[in-house]
Swiss-Prot record:
Keywords: Amidation, Neuropeptide, Secreted. The keyword Transmembrane does not apply. Belongs to the pyrokinin family. This is Pyrokinin-4. Expressed in the brain, subesophageal ganglion and in the retrocerebral complex (mainly corpora cardiaca). GO terms for cellular component: extracellular region. GO terms for biological process: neuropeptide signaling pathway. It is found in: Secreted. Mediates visceral muscle contractile activity (myotropic activity). It comes from Celatoblatta sp. (strain Blue Mountains). It comes from the Eukaryota.
Length: 12
């Protein structure tokens, strides 16, 4: 579980 760059949740 690593949220480096939003891959699962893209920042729009």
């Amino acid at each position: 579980d690593h949220m480096s760059h939003d891959v699962y949740s893209p920042r729009l």
